[in-house]
Amino acid sequence: MPDTLRINGQRLWNSLMELAQIGATDKGGVKRLTLTDLDRQGRDLVVGWAREAGMTVTVDKIGNVFMRRPGRDDSLPPVMTGSHIDTQPTGGKFDGNYGVLAGLEVVRTLNDQGIVTDAPIEVAFWTNEEGSRFVPVMMGSGVFCGAFSLETAYAAKDVEGKTVREELERIGYLGSEEPGRHPIGAYFEAHIEQGPVLEDANKVIGVVPAVMGLSWYDCTVSGMEAHAGPTPMGLRRDALQVATTIMQEVVAIANRYPPYGRGTVGMVQVFPNSRNVIPGQVKFSIDLRNVNDELLNTMHEEMLAFVARTRQETGLGIEIERVSYYPPCPFHPDCVNAVRAATEKLGYSTMDVVSGAGHDAIYTARVAPSGMIFVPCKDGISHNEIEDAQPAHLEAGCNVLLHAMLERAGVAKDAVREGEAASA
């Protein structure tokens, strides 16, 4: 495939900006929660673009959408790319959306140049990646890859008691294809990094060898509420004081296992939350991550051991429950190498970046060779209305996606017209 082949960066940007108008917020972000009317509008727009590009569209029973460009040999499993178009309540324009529309731009570029691939090319968008309306996160790809059942997903409810199945049917995306029956030859996902590493290193492309595993916990510390004035310090059963020592240990554990140890307390509830009452109970979340599963398990064991010691030393009631776990996900060497080779061929500055966030690709990796491409986002900010990315970086990532997919899909002989380079 000629090294001069490039996508149309302006067309990609225009598509991103048009999709971002659906659910646009006053602060420049997007609120398009999964399976809402706005999600339906976004889905309809992307599906319409796919059909304009000559693609056929299939929807499965969890609402995952697969848009297919035929290959010379349609019996071959497709080379797929994709991501999601649902957002956080205060989301940005690029998280997920970039991966879907970069895939669409790959197809448009192949159409422009009359290129026929040996294997079909598919672009997917997965249902409820964000998990901001329904739990679990990455629902569509998880059901597709067998991480949990369709029945479990259907039964999930939002805060108003509406179920996933009801909402899929209501918006017209309750498909007929059985999840997981759709073959994948290889899967690539282009994404903004959602962190500051690439920008800090002044690199354009992140080659992603793996995604960190994580353990999530709910922790409750129970003491005794009492008046803040009359109760001496030595006679208190202060739940917040003890909870704080556990929170500090979360950070200490992460710092013991650099460079990929992560420890976060993101949610805290204090009861009764009164200025002059010693807290009687504290509930909080714990998030531990590492790219090495053995180290992640060590962090888990150290967390439990510290809680047990603290319970014994303080005499307070302390409960900790692991509520979610997924192991680190190393991506397939062939896909990682395809991304690396495409980046080097195109001359972009690059570095390896381990993903600290979960993506649909961690589930596709269970059923097909998978890989990811990162591009920088401004100040590393994501899941925020001010999320931003440079058009040139988005274009570069899409060019890498194009060449990596072509390397895997193959190009039929005599299938490229002269003058094949699209405008950059």
Task: Locate each region found by the language model.
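A short beta-alpha structural unit
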Residues: 34, 264-273, 285-291, 317-336, ...
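N-terminal capping segment at the start of a domain
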Residues: 2-36, 326, 383
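Alpha-helical metal-binding/catalytic segments enriched in His/Glu/Asp
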Residues: 19, 81, 91-130, 215-221, ...
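Flexible, glycine/charged-enriched surface loops at secondary-structure junctions
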Residues: 60, 116-118, 175-180, 230, ...
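Zn-dependent metallopeptidase/amidohydrolase metal-coordination segment
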Residues: 12-25, 82-83, 350-400, 405-408
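Midchain, well-structured core segments that form catalytic/ion-binding scaffolds
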Residues: 128-129, 133-294
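Active-site metal-coordination/substrate-binding segment of hydrolases
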Residues: 47-51, 56, 60, 66-167, ...
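His/Asp/Glu-rich mid-to-C-terminal helical/loop segments that flank catalytic regions of hydrolases
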Residues: 227, 231-256, 300-305, 350, ...
